[in-house]
A protein has these predicted regions:
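Intrinsically disordered, low-complexity regulatory regions
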Residues: 1-102
């Protein structure tokens, strides 16, 4: 997802939501946000009527790229987008097998 291309996420001043989040939330909060977005789109991929698997997977990948950039920009880790997608795909797989509270 090109955040600058998706103008439906901009306010009346043209500021993108993604830029607002980066300015107003700390590193840990942003990691949580991006992780949940990747997880959401991986779980949803191929299930939402009118949305292809590929479209949702690409959205997950775009958020994973943002997460990798965030981590690398903060020089805390050196994760690749593939690392992140693999890790969060594992979470999505766990969710698909989860039967709820046991």
């Amino acid at each position: 997802m090109d955040f600058k291309e998706n103008r439906h996420y901009a306010n009346k001043y043209g500021v993108e939501l993604n830029e607002y989040l980066k300015h107003n939330f700390n590193y840990e909060e942003l990691v949580g946000w991006y992780t949940m977005q990747v997880l959401k789109y991986l779980v949803r991929a191929g299930k939402k009527e009118g949305e292809s698997y590929g479209k949702d997977y690409k959205k997950a990948l775009d958020y994973a790229k943002e997460l990798a950039n965030l981590s690398n920009d903060n020089e805390l880790t050196e994760y690749t987008t593939d690392d992140i997608m693999g890790f969060i795909q594992g979470m999505a797989d766990d969710f698909e097998q989860w039967k709820g509270e046991e």
